[in-house]
């Protein structure tokens, strides 16, 4: 608790609040993603706080992967630049970073290294090259039976 400054962005706040209203709204978002077995994912609140604070640069939240300025207004949740939390290691809430919705959807259940490899191979195709199919990761969820959402 800092008393009069937001621990994320440094904006003035009131005692005993640790985060300003804007940052608190982001930190308190309800997790709707599900794990491989269909259960709701657990949120690592401390990791999310670190990720959000780490993404704050030059007066804005920035995407971990692209550095672009993110949109935090919930009414614009369908925008590709909307701020979301993303696990660098799928299912590991402690590895969470702040990213844009588009990158999060593209990365989905890939690790950071797998994502970089796929994007690099895709760029080769865009430049007239050939995609190396060896870049596809093994199927991490093969044999996993998903429960339908409750």
Predicted regions and their residues:
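Short Cys/His-rich "knuckle" micro-motifs
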Residues: 14-19, 73-76, 108-112
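Short Cys/His-rich Zn2+-coordinating modules
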Residues: 2-7, 38-53, 80-87
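Short, charged surface segments at domain edges that flank catalytic/cofactor-binding sites
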Residues: 26-62
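A detector for short metal-coordination/catalytic motifs
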Residues: 93-150
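Short metal-coordination and nucleic-acid-contact micro-motifs, chiefly zinc-binding Cys/His arrays
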Residues: 2-5, 16, 55-61, 93-96
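Short cysteine/histidine-rich metal-coordination sites, predominantly Zn2+-binding motifs
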Residues: 21-27, 77-91, 114-122
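BZIP DNA-binding basic region
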Residues: 1-29
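Histidine-centered nuclease catalytic patch
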Residues: 48-50, 61-102, 107
């Amino acid at each position: 608790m800092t008393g009069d400054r937001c621990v994320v962005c440094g904006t003035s706040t009131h005692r005993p609040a640790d985060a300003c209203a804007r940052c608190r709204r982001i930190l308190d978002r309800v997790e709707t993603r599900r794990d491989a077995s269909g259960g709701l994912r657990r949120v690592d609140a401390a990791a999310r706080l670190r990720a959000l604070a780490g993404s704050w640069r030059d007066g804005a939240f920035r995407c971990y992967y692209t550095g672009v300025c993110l949109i935090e207004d919930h009414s614009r949740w369908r925008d590709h630049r909307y701020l979301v939390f993303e696990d660098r290691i799928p299912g590991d809430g402690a590895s969470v970073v702040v990213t844009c919705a588009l990158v999060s959807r593209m990365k989905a259940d890939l690790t950071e290294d797998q994502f970089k490899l796929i994007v690099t191979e895709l760029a080769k195709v865009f430049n007239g090259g050939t995609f190396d199919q060896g870049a596809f990761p093994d199927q991490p969820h093969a044999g996993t039976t998903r429960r339908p959402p409750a």
